[in-house]
Regions:
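Structural signature of hydrophobic alpha-helical transmembrane segments
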Residues: 4-18, 62-76, 130-135, 258-270, ...
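C-terminal transmembrane helix pair
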Residues: 306, 313, 327-436
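Entry/N-cap segments of selected transmembrane alpha helices
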Residues: 83-114, 235-238, 294, 310-339, ...
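Hydrophobic transmembrane alpha-helices of secondary-active transporters
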Residues: 19, 45-52, 65-93, 269-278, ...
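Interfacial helix-loop-helix linkers and transmembrane-helix boundary segments
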Residues: 30-37, 58-66, 83-100, 280-293, ...
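Alpha-helical membrane segments and immediately flanking helix-loop junctions
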Residues: 103, 115, 123-159, 163, ...
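Intrinsically disordered, low-complexity non-transmembrane regions of multi-pass membrane transporters
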Residues: 1-7, 185-232, 279-283, 437-440
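Flexible hinge motifs at transmembrane-helix junctions and intramembrane kinks/re-entrant loops
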Residues: 26-42, 55-66, 181, 246-290
Length: 440
């Protein structure tokens, strides 16, 4: 297509929106898609990739889809601080969930970095950063893949975005396909504390259509519509935080030319700062977590669709063999960690917590919640309660990994970064195992 204009963005948005609706129709009508809980946004991205300029060339999609994904991730992170409120739960159980999740995240990053540098790059001419496309896509999903890929692109390694997006797409499919297999095996072997046999998926989860009696509000109307729409206020707040994030990122680059802080991480910092300041005022009473969560979900749907549709098939083909080895070895490592560590760290409901963690360690939080809904339909494990609190400590580490990894790897310190992740991950796991034995 020609030069970029505002209508170029409108056309891209319209096409992707149409594909999301097609994806939703496919999810509702086709049992195979329902069985594996494939999100409409993923279907939209795959269709857009197949029909777009990278493959068949039937859709007039521009070459800006990857840029849109990079912008949308800033909106997701800007809204993140406002999507939940924190409280206190049983400290010991929250601590175990934190250690299990944080240790696993660090070890997955260490594994990807080390296998890329010490094994794959010795066989193929690869950049040091090749290996971390696996944890960026698996543990972080399409959001983190877009974030880290955009950061690497700004530093001259544009292929990382495609590799990480491919990893995220493979991960989200494996999270459900293998997750359901693990669930059936575990139930048959008596690991489950909540099920006696593998349960079938509720229709609401399969089709994604919520029955009229089960529908919940996507937010509260905190302003009178005669003054300003509640959605307008929350969207304006999110956009303002993204602007602050952009200015902070550009300002940091001017003050320290070697420092390239991604806009998304600066937006998260800006959001956390604003939230911290506003908690002392009555403004906090007019920020609705459900509304911010709904907006974040919308941004994420478009992020996933744009991200997958922007995958460069030529790059995937160029790296197909080492990428396949990386992703398969990552699945094996994650499987071993998830189930072996859970069995030794958690005193009760270890299998349910492992199934949930498998979902988000390879796919997304939504995949983990879907698997947990099957494994623990009555929420007896309180897994989500503990994880919600633990994530307050996990999130800063995750954002730090995504923020600083591109700068460190492109400067040739990838091995040091991976070894630090390994040491920290093993330290957390050792502490949790010792603590678990003492508290028996």
């Amino acid at each position: 297509m020609g030069s970029f204009t505002p209508w170029t963005m409108v056309i891209d948005l319209g096409i992707i929106s149409a594909l999301i609706l097609v994806g939703k129709y496919i999810r509702v009508k086709f049992p195979f898609v329902q069985k594996f809980l494939i999100p409409p946004s993923v279907l939209a991205g795959v269709i857009g990739l197949a029909l777009g300029p990278e493959v068949l060339g039937w859709l007039p999609i521009s070459g800006n889809l990857g840029t849109y994904a990079g912008i949308l991730i800033a909106f997701v992170f800007a809204s993140l601080p406002f999507t939940s409120s924190t409280g206190s739960k049983e400290f010991g159980k929250v601590k175990r969930m934190w250690g299990y999740s944080q240790g696993g995240m660090l070890l997955q990053w260490a594994f990807g970095g080390l296998i890329g540098i010490l094994v794959l790059s010795r066989i193929w001419p690869l950049n040091e950063s090749f290996g971390i496309s696996m944890p960026a896509g698996y543990c972080g999903g399409h959001g983190s893949a877009a974030a880290i890929g955009s950061a690497f692109a700004g530093l001259g390694q544009e292929e990382v975005l495609t590799l990480a997006m491919t990893a995220a797409t493979v991960g989200i499919i494996c999270s459900i396909v293998l997750g359901l297999i693990f669930l059936r095996i575990g139930t048959r072997r008596g690991y489950s504390s909540c099920l006696t046999q593998a349960e079938t998926l509720p229709e609401e989860l399969r089709t994604g259509l919520v029955a009229k009696d089960n529908r919940r509000s996507i937010g509260e109307e905190v302003f009178s519509s005669i003054s300003v729409s509640t959605l307008t206020f929350h969207l304006s707040l999110t956009a303002l935080i993204v602007l602050f994030g952009y200015l902070l990122s550009r300002g940091g680059a001017k003050l320290a030319p070697g420092l390239e802080l991604p806009v998304f991480s600066c937006a998260y910092i800006a959001g956390m700062t604003i939230k911290s300041l506003w908690k002392y005022t009555n403004i906090k009473d007019y920020i609705c977590p459900q509304t911010m969560s709904s907006l974040s979900g919308m941004f994420t749907d478009y992020l996933v669709a744009f991200g997958i549709a922007s995958i460069k098939i030529s790059i995937v083909g160029q790296y197909i063999v080492p990428l396949t080895i990386l992703l398969l070895s990552g699945l094996v490592f994650t499987t071993l960690y998830i189930f072996l560590a859970a069995k030794h760290i958690f005193k009760e409901y270890w299998f349910e917590k492992a199934i949930f963690s498998w979902g988000w360690f390879t796919g997304t939080m939504a995949m983990g919640m879907a698997l947990l809904r099957i494994a623990d339909p009555q929420s007896r494990s309180k897994c989500m309660d503990y994880y919600a609190i633990a994530y307050v400590l996990i999130a800063p580490v995750e954002i730090a990994l995504i923020t600083f990894a591109p700068m460190i790897f492109t400067r040739g310190y990838g091995l040091l970064f991976s070894l630090i992740c390994l040491i920290l991950g093993l330290s957390v796991m050792t502490y949790m195992l010792i603590n678990s034995r003492r508290s028996k």
